[in-house]
Amino acid sequence: MKRLLILIARAWQLGPSRVLPPSCRYSPSCSQYAIEALEKHGAIKGGWLAAKRLLRCHPWGGHGYDPVP
């Protein structure tokens, strides 16, 4: 499961993310954050952290450096 989720995030980085203008308000990008969270915490907790990050990434959300805990 973890590998599949990482593969999806990598596919996003290599596909649509390269064509679309940068829109992530955080550093590292949301897809990189998801990969790091999944590698560090596994599919369940890492997936939860990635989902929470994606929900925070909007025009009225925060911004700046936000590392994986």
Curated annotation (Swiss-Prot):
* Any one cellular-component term (Gene Ontology): plasma membrane
Q: Which InterPro entries match?
A: Membr_insert_effic_factor_YidD (IPR002696)
Task: List localization entries.
Answer: Cell inner membrane
Q: How does it sit in the membrane?
A: Peripheral membrane protein
Task performed by this protein: Could be involved in insertion of integral membrane proteins into the membrane.
| PANTHER family, sorted | MEMBRANE PROTEIN INSERTION EFFICIENCY FACTOR-RELATED
Specify the protein name. Putative membrane protein insertion efficiency factor
Q: Which organism is it from?
A: Novosphingobium aromaticivorans (strain ATCC 700278 / DSM 12444 / CCUG 56034 / CIP 105152 / NBRC 16084 / F199)
